[in-house]
């Protein structure tokens, strides 16, 4: 049985909390029989009111008490799924939660599939598909900023914009269809139509320009530089723990070390890489190839140089490829006039630090933050990959429409392109495989 074909009138049940010893375990039901099934295992069976907590006990088939619980009934349509929903709040623990779950299954409830509660919320019109995806994105948010974006979309920020764009396209389609049906002289004034179309394309492009990957995956920062420049020491200083191995021997780091942390609500992913030098073994060759690969995929490069040898050039493949900060390390060893001369002739943002003694580390962090805020703005709307693909498809149909207008194609072709763009933005026109792909990512109980 696929999620898209679930018969939503039956009653489902699942443990909604992490199954482990804890303070509280929540067992959730949804469906027409949710209230009856919950009452069937509870001692107190009267005076159940929607959205009011009930203190009672759960008992088994032999009337043996299982646990003291709080029960919260939520009658349709004022619930997450717009069905009758009941949450049983028991003491945390594997045995108690599973016992209550099994009692409810024995009485006729079906064990929910991953994401089935949210799927029912979507099918019953409680959430749009974009909002349903936002629930998942909120659960898996890697940073405070991403959580805020997910919550904003859950409250309808993206759905509202998509609805607005789609409504404007429908208005354009209505103009075309009305002309085809009723205009006998077969003339159509395109100036206003073209202006509206251009405005809609710009709206879609603005959504596509949102750098959403930074919210979802964080800012990727690569530490690159020659061997023995102190990259690993600086890496450890930035993340606040001893993650990379540090020795006086050049070339100690032979593999990429990654660490993730949050600064000012943004997720940063730091990569410590092997020092760049003339390879003396196959391992070193592979390590430096990996470092160059990280350089290509990251968003910001820290080019780290030993302050005692400040004249080492930046490799050509790093020049003008992406934002780059030059970090002169080991100023505790040497901060000579030669370094000052080099700094005067460097076009990239620079900072002098001592990773060993954390000198100017706050200044380096501030520079990293400044570069990050130039990559994206915190007030943008988040769109995921599926939504981005649909927006790109809609835009392509509209661009094809523009070409058709320029080439004098009949209005029937214009109408066809408009209908295709409108369909791309229809949140209710989703096939079963897409629904399965989305909701199967949820945990059971959500």
Curated annotation (Swiss-Prot):
Free-text cofactor note: Binds 1 potassium ion per subunit.
Any Pfam family matching the protein: MnmE_helical
Per UniProt, (6S)-5-formyl-5,6,7,8-tetrahydrofolate binds at 28, 87, 126, 446
Chloroplast in keyword set: yes
Where does this polypeptide localize? Answer: Plastid, Chloroplast
Q: Cofactor(s) for this protein?
A: K(+)
* Disulfide partners: none
The record, for InterPro entries, names: G_TrmE, GTP-bd, GTP-bd_TrmE_N, GTPase_MnmE, MnmE_dom2, MnmE_helical, P-loop_NTPase, Small_GTP-bd
Question: What is an annotated GO biological process for this record, any one?
Answer: tRNA wobble uridine modification
Q: Which GO terms describe its cellular component?
A: chloroplast; cytosol
- The protein, known as: Probable tRNA modification GTPase MnmE
Species source reads Cyanidioschyzon merolae (strain NIES-3377 / 10D)
């Amino acid at each position: 049985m696929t999620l898209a074909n679930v018969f939503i009138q039956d009653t489902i049940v699942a443990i909604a909390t992490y199954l482990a010893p804890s303070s509280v375990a929540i067992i959730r039901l949804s469906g027409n029989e949710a209230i009856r099934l919950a009452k069937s295992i509870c001692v107190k069976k009267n005076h159940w009111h929607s959205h009011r907590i009930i203190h009672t006990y759960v008992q088994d088939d032999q009337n043996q008490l299982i646990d003291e619980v709080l029960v919260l009934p939520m009658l349709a349509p004022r619930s997450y799924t717009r069905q009758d929903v009941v949450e049983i709040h028991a003491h945390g623990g594997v045995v108690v939660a599973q016992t209550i779950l099994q009692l409810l299954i024995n009485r006729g409830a079906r064990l929910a599939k991953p994401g089935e509660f949210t799927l029912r919320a979507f099918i019953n019109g409680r959430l749009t598909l974009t909002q349903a995806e936002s629930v998942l994105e909120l659960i898996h948010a890697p940073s405070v900023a991403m959580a805020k974006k997910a919550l904003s979309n859950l409250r309808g920020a993206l759905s509202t914009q998509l609805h607005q764009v789609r409504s404007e396209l429908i208005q354009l389609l209505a103009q075309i269809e009305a002309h085809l049906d009723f205009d006998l002289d077969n003339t159509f004034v395109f100036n206003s139509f073209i202006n509206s179309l251009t405005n809609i394309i710009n709206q879609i492009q603005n959504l596509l320009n949102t750098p959403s990957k930074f919210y979802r995956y964080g800012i990727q920062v690569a530490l690159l530089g020659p061997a023995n420049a102190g990259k690993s020491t600086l890496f450890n200083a930035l993340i606040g723990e001893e993650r990379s191995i540090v020795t006086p021997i050049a070339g100690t780091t032979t593999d990429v070390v990654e660490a993730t942390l949050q600064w000012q609500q943004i997720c940063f992913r730091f990569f410590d890489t092997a020092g760049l030098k003339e390879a003396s073994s196959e391992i070193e060759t592979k390590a430096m190839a990996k470092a160059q690969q990280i350089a290509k995929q990251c968003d910001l490069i820290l080019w780290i140089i030993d302050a005692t040898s400040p004249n080492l050039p930046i490799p050509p493949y790093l020049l003008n490829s992406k934002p780059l900060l030059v970090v002169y390390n080991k100023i505790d060893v040497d901060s000579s006039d030669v370094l000052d001369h080099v700094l005067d002739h460097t076009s990239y943002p620079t900072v002098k630090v001592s990773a060993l003694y954390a000198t100017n580390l706050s200044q380096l962090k501030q520079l990293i933050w400044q570069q990050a805020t130039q990559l994206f703005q915190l007030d943008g709307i988040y769109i995921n990959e599926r939504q981005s693909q649909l927006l790109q498809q809609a835009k392509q149909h509209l661009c094809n429409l523009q070409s058709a207008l320029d080439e004098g194609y009949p209005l029937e072709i214009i109408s066809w392109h408009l209908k295709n763009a409108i369909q791309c933005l229809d949140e209710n026109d989703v096939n079963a495989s897409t629904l399965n792909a989305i909701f199967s990512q949820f945990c059971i109980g959500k």
